[in-house]
């Protein structure tokens, strides 16, 4: 048994690893900048978690793990290094966590959380992912098994440390380019390196970069391999059915072509571990993941959806699904609430963001969630002028409605049609309120 301390333990990726090592029998402590639902849950599970960070948290731990958000001057990190305790980033600790496991690793700019969660429904084993699966209510599931379904992150190239037995790549659209010195060759080399580390590879072969690879791989061609795509709504819950290659018909929770693609990649990966009949049945156990087309409230008058999409490609894919969902329900009004996430992402992808909201009836824009970045000047009013957007500092959930005060002091209330919030910051907390 090791004593392991996690700095930034409330983060979605770090908390999953902490939970996994705790279940393996290690003594886990941790800290974060403030209390959250996650830190409370970790305490309830038996971990020693404190807030905020303080040097007294560093005692006699065997090693310390810190999240990507932690800077070198963090008081706990400084204290641990002063005491000579080994310190590892999340990226650096992965070989220790995964070294003796048969890892089913899922990477990609978009869809990796959903695909990972779907795959965790299809095969037996532990699960370490960057989202809360509604099937088991956590970002981690522990099993006495060599198998681990792992969501592999390209943002800091940590997927290269994931020891994949089987590697899935949903797509390789350039993102987090600051980590790769804005060098596309470095970025694509990392994806190629990730795939080369695996014995089995499953890829979306219609991705611009992945289509050029000469590696031995199981290839999904969505435009021809996925047929008879159909969507249906039952009790306000979305489902997608489709035929995959010569494998027959499947149904999965969620709505849209991108959901069928994610499910197809998970199915092709699971075929190495699970009989086809069981895959078809197990896929029905998937109930979606938190913050992905997450229906918070639904009745005949008002539907509120929380979605983590924070890149133009993701927002457009989700909105296409929302429009289809609205059509099936006979709803005519769709309002989008957008909280930009990181100044660098907003400025780099501004043209994409200007285009991705086409079709919405109303656009509400929140301030940029900086995530620690320094501000970059962006003319938001000019960029989004075609939408005549409403700007507000925050939104509030009030019963079955969303309320906010706009920049002119006028109070607004959204209580009919579909309202969908987009962002990776704290918009989810605003939309949920105390509900």
UniProtKB/Swiss-Prot annotation:
Q: Which family does it belong to?
A: Belongs to the MurCDEF family.
Q: Residues that bind ATP, according to the entry?
A: 108-114
Subcellular location field: Cytoplasm
Q: Give the principal location in a single coarse category.
A: cytoplasm
* Organism classification: Bacteria, Pseudomonadati, Campylobacterota, Epsilonproteobacteria, Campylobacterales
Q: Name one GO cellular component term.
A: cytoplasm
Q: In which pathway does it act?
A: Cell wall biogenesis; peptidoglycan biosynthesis
| Biological role stated in the UniProt entry | Cell wall formation.
The catalytic activity, as recorded, is: UDP-N-acetyl-alpha-D-muramate + L-alanine + ATP = UDP-N-acetyl-alpha-D-muramoyl-L-alanine + ADP + phosphate + H(+)
Q: Which SUPFAM superfamilies match?
A: MurCD N-terminal domain, MurD-like peptide ligases, catalytic domain, MurD-like peptide ligases, peptide-binding domain
GO molecular function annotation: ATP binding; UDP-N-acetylmuramate-L-alanine ligase activity
Q: From the Swiss-Prot or TrEMBL record, give the protein name.
A: UDP-N-acetylmuramate--L-alanine ligase
């Amino acid at each position: 048994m090791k004593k392991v301390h996690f700095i930034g333990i409330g983060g979605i990726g770090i908390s999953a690893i902490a939970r996994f090592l705790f279940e393996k029998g290690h003594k886990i402590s941790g800290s974060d900048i403030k209390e959250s639902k996650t830190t409370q849950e970790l305490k309830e599970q038996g971990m020693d978690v404190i807030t905020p960070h303080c040097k007294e948290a560093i005692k006699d731990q065997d090693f310390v793990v810190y999240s990507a958000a932690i800077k070198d001057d963090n008081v706990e990190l400084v204290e641990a290094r002063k005491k000579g305790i080994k310190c590892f980033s999340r990226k650096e600790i992965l070989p220790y966590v995964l070294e003796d496991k048969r890892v089913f690793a899922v990477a990609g700019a978009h869809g990796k959380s959903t695909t990972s969660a779907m795959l965790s429904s299809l095969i037996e084993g532990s699960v370490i992912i960057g989202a809360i699966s509604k099937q088991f209510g956590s970002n981690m599931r522990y099993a006495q098994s060599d198998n681990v379904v792992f969501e592999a992150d390209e943002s800091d190239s940590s997927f290269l440390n994931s020891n994949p037995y089987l590697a899935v790549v949903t797509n390789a659209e350039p993102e987090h380019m600051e980590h790769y010195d804005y060098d596309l060759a470095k970025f694509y080399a990392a994806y190629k390196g990730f795939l080369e580390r695996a014995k089995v590879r499953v890829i979306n072969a219609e991705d611009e970069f992945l289509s050029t690879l000469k590696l031995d791989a199981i290839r999904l061609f969505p435009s021809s391999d996925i047929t008879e795509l159909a969507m249906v709504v039952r009790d306000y819950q979305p489902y997608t059915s489709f035929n995959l290659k010569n494998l027959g018909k499947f149904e999965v929770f969620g709505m849209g072509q991108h959901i069928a693609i994610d499910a197809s990649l998970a199915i092709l990966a699971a075929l190495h571990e699970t009989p086809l009949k069981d895959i078809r049945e197990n896929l029905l156990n998937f109930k979606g993941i938190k913050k992905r087309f997450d229906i918070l409230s639904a009745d005949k008058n008002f539907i509120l959806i929380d979605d983590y999409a924070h890149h133009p490609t993701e927002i457009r894919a989700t909105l296409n699904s929302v429009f289809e969902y609205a059509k099936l329900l006979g709803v005519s009004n769709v309002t989008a609430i957008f909280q930009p996430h990181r100044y660098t992402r907003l400025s780099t992808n501004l043209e994409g963001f200007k285009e991705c909201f086409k079709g919405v009836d109303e656009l509400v824009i929140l301030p940029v969630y900086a995530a620690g970045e320094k501000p970059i000047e962006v003319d938001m009013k000019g960029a989004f002028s075609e939408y005549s957007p409403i700007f507000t500092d925050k939104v509030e959930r009030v019963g079955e409605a969303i309320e906010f005060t706009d920049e002119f002091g006028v109070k607004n209330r959204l209580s009919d049609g579909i309202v969908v919030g987009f962002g990776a910051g704290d918009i989810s907390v605003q939309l949920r309120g105390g509900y």
